[in-house]
């Protein structure tokens, strides 16, 4: 995994926060964001996840850093998690279903670290052999209903009078497939 320096939250940014509620993350720790196989400038999941970590860190005076696995493998995602924890991360944010096996392997090794998995479902949390693994209390997953956005897009284009339609997704991954199904149903 590759450490990538990120600017630390400034004192000025911490002073600007006027909210009375305490941040969900202790200022003693650090937020780590690990990219899947992309980069934080991909204009997609990695970038928006990184920008959100930066905004949260700046607002709450919490350090942040991102890590990019050396290769697109479960082992390298695990190595990136280990590196982030060694660097003091108390929260690790991971965008994408590819993190399922890494979470399954690491969640119990670091019970004091909060893992936030974006666009990951319980079905994605499998060990390196593909066996389903339960989610520990320190893991928070959120997934999207891409088919709803796809449905609305399909409906809108059909309502606009377009009848000769097609759908081309970037890759045949679960999120894109769900979006495509929704698009076709909305256009129908």
Please state what every model-predicted region is:
Residues 1-188:
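A residue-level marker of the well-folded mature domains of exported/periplasmic proteins
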